[in-house]
Amino acid sequence: SSTTHRLTENGVDVTGLHTDRSPTSLAVVSVSPDGERSFRFMRGADANLSPDEIDEGWVDRSKVLHFGSVSLTAGMSRSATIFAARRAHKTGKLVSYDPNYRPSLWRGREEAMQWLQIPLPLAGMVKMSREELPLLTGSEDLERGSEILEDMGIQLVVVTLGAQGAFYRWRGRTGQVPGKEIEAADTNGAGDTFLGALLYR
């Protein structure tokens, strides 16, 4: 397809790519005058990814497997995501997880908490927002919440704090990296950019 060709031209490896006749999923983000965001999702092709479409050899050849929680909101893609994460964990790859909680994708908070917590023992690195920490650990305290996650075997826990920067726990040590003062017009994609840069380092 033209999209696949464009990706390849720009250096994106499309090995393991599967196509589906369903439309592409859409996320519509509205930003209020005070900067608050609201999300509306229309799920499509990605929700149909099945475990059969996960190439174990592709997982085995990778260095990092990263996933977010949107794929955990639909039964088929949930199975595929957990299958891939288990395979990567078993073969010693770095499993990176972003439990990006979007209430409108779940039937309720209890369901979200159940499924958001399942991948945690498979992850070597987890990045979340301050609001997501209690969903995963039951604790709002950065030190205690990150310790709970470390006890599950997670080596690096990162909690983003908006303008205050980021808190981290790395192999028993904790710290905070301050944010830089800027005039933010739109923070969409900020967490993804932060995590991409962190994984690259």
Go through each PLM region and give its residues.
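Acidic, amphipathic alpha-helical patches
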Residues: I54-D55, L116, G145, A184
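Generic detector of well-ordered alpha-helical packing
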Residues: G35, P99-Y101, R130, L161, ...
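Conserved beta-alpha-beta core of the PfkB/ribokinase-like small-molecule kinase fold
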Residues: V70-I148, Q164-A166
